[in-house]
Amino acid sequence: MAERVLTDNIRRRDAVLATESPAGEALRAGIARGPEAMLAEMKVSNLRGRGGAGFTTYIKWESARRATCRHAPPARYVVCNADEGEPGTFKDRVLLTSHADLVFDGMSVAGVTIGAEKGLLYLRGEYAYLLPALQENLERRRRNGLLGPALCGRADLAFDIDIHLGAGAYVCGEE
C-alpha cells in the first residue's frame, strides 16, 4: 500500500498559493507601484481578510494610512494576527509553515503602503515550534535587504518585523 504524506491539508489552491513566488517579488512590485497605486489595486481587488468578518483590505489599509496621530512622525504598525483561536482552524499554521515568505512580503507591502516601519506577527502560543524557522526566515530577509533599513535598496524606506508569542488565549480581531 502506498504511503500518503499530508503536508498542509489544502485541497484547492488559489492563484497565490498555486505558484511559487521568489521572496521579495511582491514587495519589489509594491514599492515600484507606490502607496497610492497599491491602495487603488486593493480597492479594485476587493481582497478580504481570512478571519471571517469580511472587512476589505482596502478599508483597513486606507484607514491606517489616513489616521492622524498626535506624535510626529506618526507611528504606524502592521499587525498580523496569527493566533488562530477559532475552533478547528489551521489556516495560520499552514500559511506560516509553507508560505511564510508570502506572509512577510504581504506585511512589508502593507507597511510600505500605510507608512509603517514596524510589523508585529502575533503567533499563537501553541505554534511556538514554528518560531525558530520563522526567526531564521526573518534573518535571511534582513541579510537580503527585504527587511530593515534601506528596504530593497531604498534609503527612504525601512520596515522590520518582530514576532510576539501568545499565551494560548483568544485575543481579538484585526480591526
Where in the sequence are the language-model features?
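Feature of Fe-S/electron-transfer and energy-metabolism proteins
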Residues: 1-175
